[in-house]
UniProtKB/Swiss-Prot annotation:
NDH-1 is composed of about 13 different subunits. Subunits NuoBCD, E, F, and G constitute the peripheral sector of the complex. NDH-1 shuttles electrons from NADH, via FMN and iron-sulfur (Fe-S) centers, to quinones in the respiratory chain. The immediate electron acceptor for the enzyme in this species is believed to be ubiquinone. Couples the redox reaction to proton translocation (for every two electrons transferred, four hydrogen ions are translocated across the cytoplasmic membrane), and thus conserves the redox energy in a proton gradient. Residues 411-791 are annotated as: NADH dehydrogenase I subunit D. One of its GO terms (cellular component) is plasma membrane. GO terms for molecular function: 4 iron, 4 sulfur cluster binding; iron ion binding; NAD binding; NADH dehydrogenase (ubiquinone) activity; NADH:ubiquinone reductase (non-electrogenic) activity; quinone binding. InterPro entries: NADH_DH_suC (IPR010218), NADH_Q_OxRdtase_suD (IPR001135), NADH_quin_OxRdtase_su_C/D-like (IPR037232), NADH_UbQ_OxRdtase-like_20kDa (IPR006137), NADH_UbQ_OxRdtase_30kDa_su (IPR001268), NADH_UbQ_OxRdtase_49kDa_CS (IPR014029), NADH_UbQ_OxRdtase_CS (IPR020396), NADH_UQ_OxRdtase_20Kd_su (IPR006138). It is a peripheral membrane protein. This is NADH-quinone oxidoreductase subunit B/C/D.
């Protein structure tokens, strides 16, 4: 047969290869994210990384439109049923990328609330390592999936409805402890668990150096608010000053008097305590001097705006099922705090209007922050697909007392592109108007406070990074500031200034992410690509200084990890020269945009009095006309030496919250410029070697320094016995840490007070009477992060 030349416009190939070529180069990822990794995943969609080069730039809003599910972040047991449901709703063929250490294996979160790898409930094609992986790593994961599709799949027979062939994910779901190791490092010698693995604590887990002298916790200066003798007189001597307290004025009070004492403090004619800061519980059952403590202690932290400072009311409880009166009749913000205490400790509050679990699933057994509850997921039965099918969320109708026939109930979340994370809003509608709402939280609860009870004091710093995962070292600062106050550590001036500079850079970065995504929430698509470009410029500086991006874990108790690198000042100057012009561009895009303004003006209003009543802090409080900023009012970390203004706006609406954050970027730029200009010389970490690793030259000349190096390197430093609460002005509001030391190298209790928790609790006040479309603008204007909310 005579050979004929094939025309140049004809390509011969196998049908399998043609189908795989089309599928690999047009992946349709679902708009789905779980935690920190999702932010880096979304960064890969912006201009610096440009995932559109790989044909995967269009995020699909529903699982039925998508063929790629990226598990970007931690897999929580409360969220696992929804993950499985979303996966099963995707059409075939479908693929899964597990992004980040938490999704791959649980990562650093071997804790009761976290599934130890998403491959225990759904199959996975590609695992991307990192915590979080950089955008480049995610892009490599996409390329590996494309290569897998091209090389391994034979879809033609499936497409033609014939027997045989393969397409989509074919790997099995694994069972923890059966088809996968419960410890990713494998067994130790002769099958013995490795010392200090997720399976077994190291033999020397607790302190071996009680005989080492350390100074007692220092007594800090704090106001008495004119209370001398007042409570003792009014309550007949049943309320007394706690003389051992060193961080704030503290009173001991019997449980039955708590609401009356709180009501008196709130209603004082002079210097009233307008805000309930937090309700903190401590299980005292494992104290080393057990006879000195009750079974439980409940601490009420109050804030005074007139005489800036905090006050603590402390009450003691006994028994397996302790109970005290609810404070919700005095402070409405006590609602969620008391529910959390019930959920985590089993403490009941008589008279609470709706005492049920808030963070854990409704069918959870036990109370996780009690000392007898397991620390780790690997101490509990493996989580399986059957568990994910069995454990389901409460029906929406259970969140309301009465539902009329004309009422429509809708679920917004826990997976929705407009919710800024995994959270479930239950809306009660009359037409499209919101007449009531409730919030189901805890889908991002990863047991940070429980983890704090098993890490030594410095080991916990990386976990703080992942609370507000957009705020970076701001999280470190809140934690180390509280520990330093407990220990009486003096931080060198250079370290203080370095901390301020990096904290303000992260404030700008956090506000930029908020500004871009908030604009997108109300229909403006351009700003998000601009703001992420500027965020990358900040991250270039952060990476130069710390070596990390989102989670530097760079602050240390007593200072910072190391000195600033050569060239840091030039990089900072370049950014300071660049950013003001960009800020003007954002305002040109948004401030005078009639649609943007119409979507925000007068929407989601909360008054100044309501904001104080419900514990609103940060930009959201200042948007109500309240000039309250902890950097000015209760200064910390040297902020009293910097010059800046406290921006305020009137109105308390979405527009005011937008204007505040834009102006705060300007003020932060001003602070960073002062840090660059006035950076002092000297040490970058304290020379109090009881608490830090000494410099090598000091260990060679001073035996005490060498001893402290050995102790701190082997088991970590141990603060004096005591407790301390202090807070900082984080980007989203006030972030505080209440740390309790029993004199050991691990904390006895770590309480994390975050701004997102009270802000989301107050959401019904801002939402009733508005439309569903307005609701998305309202929740966007608040600026919350799910890890900050659920911890």
């Amino acid at each position: 047969m005579e050979e004929t030349e094939i025309p140049q416009n004809i390509v011969l190939t196998r049908l399998d290869d043609l189908i795989n070529w089309g599928r690999a180069n047009s992946l349709w990822p679902m708009f789905f994210g779980l935690s920190c990794c999702f932010v880096e995943m979304m960064t890969s969609f912006t201009s610096r990384y440009d995932i559109s080069r790989f044909g995967a730039e269009v995020l699909r809003g529903t699982p039925r439109e998508a063929d790629l599910m990226v598990i970007a972040g931690t897999v929580f047991k409360k969220m696992a049923p929804s993950i499985l449901r979303l996966y099963e709703q995707m059409a075939e063929p479908k693929w899964v990328i597990s992004m980040g250490s938490c999704a791959n294996s649980g990562g650093m979160y071997d804790v009761y609330s976290v599934v130890q790898g998403v491959n225990q409930i759904i199959p996975v094609d590609v695992h991307v390592p990192g915590c979080p992986p950089r955008p480049e790593a995610f892009l490599q994961g996409v390329m590996l999936l494309q290569e897998k599709i091209r090389r391994e799949e034979r879809p033609a027979r499936k497409v033609l409805h014939m027997a045989g062939g393969t397409e989509g994910t074919t790997r099995p779901v694994l069972v923890d402890g059966v088809t996968k190791s419960r410890d990713t490092r494998g067994p130790g010698m002769e099958g013995i668990a490795i010392r200090g693995t997720p399976v077994q604590h190291p033999r020397f887990w607790m302190s071996r150096s009680d005989e080492m002298w350390r100074p007692p916790a220092p007594r800090h200066d704090y106001p008495d608010f004119g209370l001398a003798g007042e409570l003792e007189t009014i309550f007949g001597g049943r309320v007394a000053v706690e003389q051992a307290a060193t961080d704030m004025l503290t009173y001991r009070c019997p449980p039955e008097l708590v609401p009356e004492v709180l009501r008196h403090l709130k209603s004082r004619s002079s210097a009233p305590f307008r805000r309930l800061e937090d309700v903190v519980c401590v299980d005292e059952s494992c104290r080393r001097e057990r006879e000195r403590f009750p079974d439980f202690t409940v601490n009420y932290h109050l804030l005074n705006f007139d005489i800036p400072g905090h006050l603590r009311i402390k009450t003691e409880l006994m028994g397996e099922t302790p109970e005290l009166p609810s404070a919700t009749g005095v402070f409405p913000a006590a609602d969620w705090y008391e529910r959390e205490a019930f959920d985590m400790y089993g403490i009941r509050f008589a008279g609470h209007p709706n005492l049920r679990r808030i963070l854990m699933p409704p069918d959870w057994e036990g109370h996780p922050l009690r000392k007898e509850h397991p620390f780790r997921a690997t101490e509990m039965p493996p989580y399986t697909t059957d568990d994910a099918r069995r454990h389901q969320a409460l029906p929406a109708s259970d969140f309301f007392d009465r539902i009329d026939e004309e009422t429509l109930i809708i679920n917004l979340g826990p997976q929705h592109p407009g919710t800024h994370g995994i959270i479930r809003f239950i809306l009660k509608l009359d037409g499209e108007e919101i007449v009531d709402m409730d919030t189901d939280i805890g889908y991002h609860h990863r047991g940070a406070e429980k983890i704090g009870e098993r890490q030594h004091w410095n080991q916990f710093i990386p976990y703080t990074d992942r609370i507000d995962y957009l705020a970076g070292v701001q999280n470190n600062l809140a934690y180390v500031n509280s520990v330093e106050r407990l220990c009486g550590i003096t931080v060198p001036d250079r370290a203080i200034t370095i901390r301020v500079m990096l904290a303000e850079l992260f404030r700008i970065a956090s506000h930029l992410v908020w500004l871009g995504t908030f604009a997108a929430d109300v229909g403006a698509m351009t700003p998000v690509f601009y703001t992420f470009t500027d965020r990358e410029k900040i991250f270039d500086i952060i990476e130069m200084v710390t070596g990390g991006r989102m989670h530097p874990s760079w602050f240390r108790i007593g200072g910072v990890t190391e000195d600033l690198p050569e060239g840091w000042d030039g990089a900072v100057k370049e950014f300071l020269d660049w950013m003001p012009g960009r800020l003007k561009e954002y305002e040109d895009l948004l401030k005078e945009n009639p649609i943007f303004k119409a979507r925000l003006k007068g929407v989601g209003v909360i008054t100044k009095d309501e904001a104080m009543e419900w514990g609103i802090t940060g930009p959201n409080l200042r948007a109500c006309g309240m000039a309250w900023d902890l950097r000015k009012k209760i200064p910390y970390n040297g902020y009293q030496h910097f010059h800046f203004e406290i921006p305020t706006e009137e109105g308390g609406d979405c527009w005011a919250r937008y204007r505040i954050r834009v102006e705060e970027i300007r003020q932060s730029l001003h602070i960073v410029a002062q840090c660059r200009k006035e950076m002092p010389a000297g040490r970058w970490i304290t020379d109090d070697y009881r608490y830090v690793l000494p410099k090598k030259r000091d260990t060679l000349h001073d035996i005490e320094s060498l001893i402290h190096h050995f102790i701190n390197a082997t088991r970590g430093m141990a603060p004096p016995r005591g407790e301390n609460y202090s807070a900082i002005e984080a980007p989203k509001g006030e972030n505080g840490y209440f740390v309790v030391s029993d004199g050991l190298n691990v904390p006895y209790r770590v309480r994390i007070k975050t701004p997102s928790f009270p802000h989301i609790q107050a959401l019904p006040l801002m939402s009733r009477g508005w439309l569903v479309a307005d609701f998305l603008a309202i929740i966007g204007s608040i600026d919350f992060v799910l890890a900050d909310l659920d911890r």
